[in-house]
Each structure stands twice: as structure tokens, then as C-alpha cells.
């Protein structure tokens, strides 16, 4: 009885037809709705967001391939490896994601599995680890570069296997290229490969602590830039007064926060007009020459 009314309303709502989102994006959307009951108010914006997620995964894979194909990816176990805290952090987060996804599938909470995978891939692997890996590949020694490439491809290959039950098409396509680089081509198809299982022994708490400290530093530097009104295209030097333990974190800041350099000093330089931020006991200062007259005029205008 309601079918004609639904058809008429749908035609009015989508006069040009329903836009194509792709099978994987549709499957991921339906998985995210799994716990909402029998009635689902389908949100096309949500499906569009998961289509963007597919694009994000594709672009991340392209980056990994550009930096690993025909290069030493650390699959020769006889070669030395040097895992940084960033490598250990993403490997540890992967174990947590694997455990959470396994529990979600066991309890038929496909929505939680989808949410866990989305957050890990987008927020942790793409937004954080890939950016840190760029620094390690550009500035690290050959052993660090080898280890970074190994981590990039092995984590990505595991991501593809984790995602496969929900997004079978894009993961199959990408896995055929990524798996050989990770020395993980154990079957002709990803659907025949073993599903990932968490190994809690690979979770290193000190790496988590260092990553949390780095995130705090990045947040404070970005706040400083905002407070000082520094344009996104302007780079400035950062001076940090703090413990020697910060030295290993500072090399990541220039690329993450658009700095010319990040330097650890015994005492901050004298600059009466430069604001100072405090982060976990460290004092941070961006050294930027400020036009005092222009700044005074701006503040007066805002007041």
C-alpha cells in the first residue's frame, strides 16, 4: 500500500536519482547501522563520508607504494631493524584495534567493528603515523628507513585483512599489491588469508607515553601559532626549554606544525613580546618578529 507513496516521495527527494557511492562504502554504511534496530533512516551524507574513507585508504596505499616499491622494506630478517617510538606506537595501536574488532564480531556488533577500523585507519595510521613516517624516511639512517618501510607495509597489509569482511572489493584490489611487499602473500586471495589476531606482547607502554607527549607538543605549538596570529604559510623557529628526553620528539615538529626548526635550549631567548606556552613541564617559544605598532592597532580594533 505504501510502496507508491514511497516511490513518489523518493522521486521528489532525488529527482536526478540516488547518487552512486560504491559497494564498499554502502557495505560500511550498513555495518555502521547494525545496532540501530530494524528501522534505519539511511543517511546519504554518512555513505558519502564512508566513500571518502575508501578514497583515504586508496590514497594512503598509493603513498606507501611510492615509498616502498623497489626499496628495502625490511623483510630480510638478517638485516638490522631500529623501531622508533612511532613505529612501536602504531604497532601497539594495531593490536588494540585487532582485539576490539575481534570482540565486536564475536558479539555481532558490526557497528563497533566499523567504528574501530574507521578511527584506527583515518585518525591513527593516516593522520598520525604516515606523517611521522615521512620524517623518518626523509631524515633517518638506512636502518630507520628500512624499519619505517617495514612498519608501513605490514600495518597496511593487516589493515586490509581487518577491513575485508566489510569492504571486500577495494581491500582485495589493494592487498594483491601490498601483500608481496609485506612478505604476506600466503594465498591467492585476501579472503583465504588468515584473519589478524592481536598480540598484546607488541604493545609498548613507553611508546604510547612518548606519542602522547608528542601530541601534546603539537597541540601547544598550534595554539601558540593561533594566539600569535601566525599565518599557515609562515614558518617560524621553535625554542624548547626542557629535559633532554624531548630531543627525540622535536624532529617531528617542523613538518607537523610548519616550523623552520625545533631546538632544545637550556634557557629560552629573551623576547619580552613573545608568549610562552608550558607543556608537561617544558616551556615553548615561537621566535617571530612582531610589528608592535601593527599588533597594537589590531588589538585596539578588536577591543
List the predicted regions and their residue ranges.
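Feature 926 captures the class I aminoacyl-tRNA synthetase adenylation module centered on the KMSKS loop
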Residues: 1-23, 48-303
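Extended amphipathic secondary-structure runs
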Residues: 17-36
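Short, solvent-exposed helix-loop connector elements
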Residues: 38-46
Amino acid at each position: 500500500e505504501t510502496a507508491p507513496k514511497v516511490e513518489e516521495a523518493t522521486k521528489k527527494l532525488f529527482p536526478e536519482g540516488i547518487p552512486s557511492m560504491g559497494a564498499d562504502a554502502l557495505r560500511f554504511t550498513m555495518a555502521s547501522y547494525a545496532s540501530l534496530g530494524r528501522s534505519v533512516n539511511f543517511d546519504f551524507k554518512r555513505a558519502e563520508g564512508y566513500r571518502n574513507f575508501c578514497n583515504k585508504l586508496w590514497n594512503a596505499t598509493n603513498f606507501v607504494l611510492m615509498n616502498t616499491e623497489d626499496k628495502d622494506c625490511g623483510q630480510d630478517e638478517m638485516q638490522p631493524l631500529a623501531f622508533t617510538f612511532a613505529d612501536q606506537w602504531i604497532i601497539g595501536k594495531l593490536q588494540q584495534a585487532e582485539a576490539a574488532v575481534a570482540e565486536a564480531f564475536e558479539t555481532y556488533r558490526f557497528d563497533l567493528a566499523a567504528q574501530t577500523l574507521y578511527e584506527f585507519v583515518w585518525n591513527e595510521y593516516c593522520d598520525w603515523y604516515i606523517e611521522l613516517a615521512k620524517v623518518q624516511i626523509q631524515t633517518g639512517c638506512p636502518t630507520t628507513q628500512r624499519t619505517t618501510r617495514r612498519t608501513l607495509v605490514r600495518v597496511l597489509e593487516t589493515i586490509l585483512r581487518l577491513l575485508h569482511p566489510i569492504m571486500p572489493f577495494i581491500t582485495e584490489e589493494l592487498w594483491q599489491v601490498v601483500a608481496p611487499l609485506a612478505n604476506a602473500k600466503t594465498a591467492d586471495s585476501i579472503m583465504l588469508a588468515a584473519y589478524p589476531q592481536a598480540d598484546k606482547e607488541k604493545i609498548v607502554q613507553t611508546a604510547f607515553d612518548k606519542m602522547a607527549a608528542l601530541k601534546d607538543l603539537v597541540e601547544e605549538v598550534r595554539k601558540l601559532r593561533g594566539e600569535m596570529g601566525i599565518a599557515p604559510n609562515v614558518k617560524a623557529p621553535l625554542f624548547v626549554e626542557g629535559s633532554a628526553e624531548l630531543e627525540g620528539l622535536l624532529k617531528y615538529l617542523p613538518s607537523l606544525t610548519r616550523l623552520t626548526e625545533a631546538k632544545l635550549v637550556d634557557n629560552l631567548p629573551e623576547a619580552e613580546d613573545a608568549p610562552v606556552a608550558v607543556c608537561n613541564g617544558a616551556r615553548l617559544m615561537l621566535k617571530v618578529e612582531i610589528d608592535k605598532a601593527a599588533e597594537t592597532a589590531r588589538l585596539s580594533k578588536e577591543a
